[in-house]
Amino acid sequence: LGLTTDNSNLLGISSEGSFGEADKSTTSFIGLEFLKRMKEYYSKSSFHIGQTSSVFNQMGMIEDIEDTYFSSFDFGIYKENIFTDRDSFGIEVYQPLRSELASMNLNLPVGRTKDKQILFENFSLDLTPSGRQINSQLVYSTNTRYFSFFGKLGLVSDEFHVKESSVKPYFQLDIEINLK
């Protein structure tokens, strides 16, 4: 459960000049996390939701950003002690932070009058992503006195929450050597 307030930017991003400036941004969020152990197996899961409200009182192209709602989740099942007493293997499914509902209202210049006054028109821009990124991956980790190893092999659909018809594979390998 949390609340953040920022008087000079929106979600850590500041703007000035013709875009306008956020006078206040408030983000509230709640999350649930679970851990269940069953002998050599365990499962972890979490779910987070939140909402951001912002106020634009300055003159600029951004008239306002309506309340934004976002979510993320993950679930994993792991087995410990596969090859050594300090390793684990698991399968994970997760969704990175995603904006569930977001829109921005813009006040854009579209022309001038004969008296050289600028004409503005309001536009509403839907910022809600077209897709939902889901990652599914196999993970393995081990630690010894001299090194740590972590690897994952996975598939991602709708990467960056952009609707696609393809599923992309990925691989990551981290090796740390202890020099002590």
Locations of the language-model features?
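Outer membrane beta-barrel transmembrane domains
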Residues: L1-K24, F29-R37, K44-S157, H161-S165
